[in-house]
């Protein structure tokens, strides 16, 4: 855990619930920023970094790319492969995070590898398979890690990634699953209901997504607890 008065780690997420998990109880030195729209996220991240930071971590959920990864798998990335090229994560920090998780009850669901990053949602199984191949075997994909990596590099700060898989590689997301996501990272129920009313056949897929999201949320909450308690959530 950070010493009193140390600069915070900035956790970069896309959604409000991820930010809430990342921030924890708000007393151990993690400040979370979030937004679903890239420019809003970059603005929030810049403001947080201007206040001072000891490191940047991309923290939240992800889509699965590895064909064997179940919902709730935790990915501690070695590098991010995205629109700005491949960026290496801080090796010492990432190794400490992985070691803490591998020494915990979350060991069986923890993996190391590459995290892919994209600028637009990747919801189809075929698209996920194509990205897995083109990225050289990336395990998971999100829409924030490349932004977090670039911001950390620009400030000379250590960077790490901890992501939990929601939708596995073989599962396509129904349109309703994304309908309620607002630009600021919050969610609204009414657009989801409208989409279901338009096409009720999406209900089964949406229920599967809800179950997958529950597994990811549980894993992410557990990872936050383990990493915070061990001190591995913070760079040295």
Residue ranges and their predicted role:
Residues 5-236:
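Glycine-rich phosphate- or other oxyanion-binding loops that anchor nucleotides, phosphorylated ligands
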Residues 1-2:
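N-terminal hydrophobic/helix-forming segments and targeting peptides
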């Amino acid at each position: 855990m950070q010493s009193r008065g140390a600069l915070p780690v900035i956790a970069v997420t896309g959604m409000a619930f991820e930010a809430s998990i990342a921030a924890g109880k708000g007393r151990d030195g993690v400040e979370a920023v979030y937004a679903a729209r890239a420019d809003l996220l970059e603005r929030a991240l810049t403001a947080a970094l201007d206040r001072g930071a000891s490191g940047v971590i991309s923290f939240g959920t992800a889509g699965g790319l590895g064909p064997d990864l179940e919902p709730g798998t935790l990915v501690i990335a070695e590098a991010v492969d995205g629109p700005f090229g491949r960026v290496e994560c801080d090796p010492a920090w990432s190794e400490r995070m992985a070691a803490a998780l591998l020494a915990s009850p979350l060991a069986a669901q923890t993996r190391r590898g590459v995290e892919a990053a994209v600028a637009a949602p990747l919801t189809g199984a075929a698209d996920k398979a194509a990205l897995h191949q083109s990225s050289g075997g990336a395990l998971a994909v999100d829409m924030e890690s490349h932004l977090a990596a670039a911001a950390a590099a620009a400030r000379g700060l250590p960077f790490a990634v901890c992501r939990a898989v929601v939708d596995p590689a073989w599962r396509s997301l129904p349109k309703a699953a994304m309908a309620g996501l607002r630009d600021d990272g919050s969610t609204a129920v009414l657009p989801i209901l409208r989409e279901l009313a338009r096409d009720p056949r999406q209900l089964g897929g949406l229920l599967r997504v809800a179950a997958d999201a529950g597994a990811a949320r549980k894993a992410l909450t557990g990872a936050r607890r383990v990493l915070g308690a061990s001190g591995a959530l913070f760079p040295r």
